[in-house]
Amino acid sequence: MALDAALPAVGRPFALARGLTARVALTIVVLASFAVRLIASAAHPAPRYFPDEYLYTAIARALGSGRAPSVRGESAHFPALLEPILAAPFQALFGPELAYRLTQAENAVLMSLAAVPVYLLAPRLSLSAGYALACAAFAVAIPDLVFASYTLADPVAYPFAMGALAAGVAALERPARRMQLLFLALAGLATFARVQYVVLPAAFVAAAVLVDRRRVLRTQRLPLFLLALPVVGAVALGPARVFGYYANVTHLHVGGALLHWAGVDLFLLAFAAGIVLVPGALVAIARPRGRTETAFAGLSAVFGSGLLLEAALYASNGSSRFQERYLFALLPLVPVGFGLYLKHGRPGRGAVALLSLALFALAAQLPLSGYAAALGKTDSPFLVAVFRLEKIVGTANGSFVLAVLAGAAAAGAVLVSRRGGGRYAVAATLAAALLASFAATVGDSANARQVRRDYLPVNASWVDATGLRDVTLLQTVGSPPASAIEQLYWNRSIAAEALLGDARATDVYAAPRVRIARDGTMTGVGTTVLVQDYAATIRFANAARVATAGTFSLWAADEAPRLELLERGRFSDGWLARSGALTVWPDASGRTRGTVRFTLSLPAGAAPTTIRFGKARYDIRPGEQTTVIYTIDARGPWSLPFSTTHGGNAQPDLRFTSVRSTPPILARAGAPAVRPAATA
């Protein structure tokens, strides 16, 4: 008998040479994973997955303060509440920074505990304790454990999903009330944490039919009855009330792109699993032997198909990228399936060869660099690791290295099927997972630190530090939602959001558009506003500027804030957009009288640009300055549009601008000029 064919049946764990018991070794795996993820979280100083991380935290704050789930005062019909419930005590007892760090620590514990059900699953399939330990280590070595640093539902749902799969196999193997109830509880918790895992009950029902066929109503009467109750309730309530925040899933389009993304997801998931184990694992799942293996195969196949459908449906409806967040719970099943393949004596050599050849051909034809570019890696820690490699060795070299590794892994799968060496394939896969996890963690930490530097001051809770409360975040036209969400995340005193003009909201929750009266009074905001100055210059007639940070300024008034001046299209660094408008509102008399002054210029090396302000045209050349003065005498608001007629200048951050302008200085007739503090 080949050595690796007997490998899963070895009585003592091959990794426990020093006499440690398997349970002690499993404990070490869990603790080591927790320690590593805790250290990695320390290097992840700010959330960056928006708006999800903010929404979970906002709901946790509402729960922690004794309120119903809500975001900025608006009721949140959010079905995935387990993560906010677990984080609520931290939000109730501690400040934003410590609550954030404690949530990360909690996530590190939960994700590391996923090793336990994976370890328990393998021996049930007659795999050795040592092999089970390798499977458990793989479950916490995958790059997706980087999500422990995020305030998302994934870290919470992952261990419950793995536990539900292990309990489901046990309940299908020997239908007993205790194990059936355990499966229902774990599947319910996984779904309560992340709605995508609603496929778990469906997978259990399908696997039960596969295992027991006509006897299923007798053997699985209790779980079938209990699972039918929420289905009846969901039908009665309707999808909008059941799915809440996710109700739009019923309106997603099903078309040809669905099949395309299903294929892409399968290919990239196989790559993320290391390729070498995948063909053998698929053969074992396709050819189960006995009741227990049939239960595992049926549960895994339907569970995987459901997640794949969800991921492909989401990607084919606008989110065109690899949805690894939906799929990574399938990765720990690969080494388990491969163990069955070894136990069976490595059958299906032809099938393994064909699958290996197909994976290699796809890897050669589809460079991963195309999927890891730009936003393609947003939901994929594996592609973050790929991008990190390409950043070090170059895109072309990185693609070549990955194609060579894919070829070697595919060849390894064929070699194992014919000559053995399964333990080396498992060891290589585990090593590859650790290496990819390290690269993903380094890349993620760098991105999170960059977000912290770009969007936040040293004290991220700077608005709270002023002592002001019930602050309204005022989003202006052209302002990026991401920077605004960071302020919402770290400052509990920001209680509302409002939109000025055609500004973009940060999320789907309460963000009414501000109405501006003829005298400039804004309705729909409180007396304290946090203004996003990224693409607008604002001054108020009756409010004082309390503090500034980056592109934000905090203003406080004794009554409703009244606008004095707004220049839409002037960026915080002084560049003007290709078009915009300058508006001045009247004084108490109802008239707008005085002068507005600003200076136009271009730095050396910029392209000469022609810009119009109203009917006047100004030709601006690099190194020159042109001072513009307008005398105003109008009843009600006065507005001056501007637009670029020739030239323009592209910025490194992809903004297409025209010329630079100093902040407009308004000098009202009979009053001293009010000069802005900014000089950009």
Regions found by a protein language model. Give the residues of each.
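Membrane-proximal lumenal/periplasmic loop motifs of glycosylation machinery
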Residues: 42-54, 65-88, 101
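Membrane-lumen/periplasm interface segments of specific transmembrane helices
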Residues: 36, 197, 201, 206-288, ...
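Short acidic/glycine- and proline-prone juxtamembrane loop motifs at membrane-interface regions
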Residues: 76, 149-157
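Membrane-interface transmembrane helices that cradle and orient dolichyl/undecaprenyl
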Residues: 123-126, 164-180, 208
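C-terminal luminal/periplasmic domains and tails of membrane-associated envelope-modifying transferases
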Residues: 10, 502-680
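Transmembrane signal-anchor helices characteristic of membrane glycosylation enzymes that use polyprenol
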Residues: 22-49, 140-141, 190, 228-239, ...
